[in-house]
Amino acid sequence: MKQELIMDAVGNDLSRQTAEIMHRFNDVFQLHDPSALAELVAQDCVIENTVPAPDGARHAGKEACIDLWSAIATQPGTRFDLEETFVAGERATIRWRYFMADGNSIRGVNLMRVADELIVEAMGYVKG
């Protein structure tokens, strides 16, 4: 099931651009199709993952970020339910619930930053 709610706090061109990038990024996980990632991720992208606790693993560089997100997006039997995407300028916050193959779920948030129309930073946090 594909779902999405994007709220734009600023309403300027930069926010609209960021909202479009987040829409395409969210589709990767909603549709289990990572093919768009190469066009969305900057060479110097950095992800701070949700695991391991307490600080999460750091993934640096386009290839490392695409590899991580591709693995998450294509995990069999899983799904992301998007609760909200909030955009303000070059920044976005994505609230989500991730359902694992065994039916258990976890809620979390990604703090995203875009520069030059590419994702340059993603910091993931989960409840738990």
Identify what each model region corresponds to.
Residues 1-43:
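Short, low-complexity N-terminal intrinsically disordered segments enriched in polar/charged residues
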Residues 14-19, 27, 58-60, 86-87, ...:
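Alpha-helical interaction segments
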Residues 62-64:
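Contiguous, function-dense segments enriched for cysteine-driven chemistry
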Residues 35, 47, 78-79:
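A general structural signal for well-ordered secondary-structure junctions
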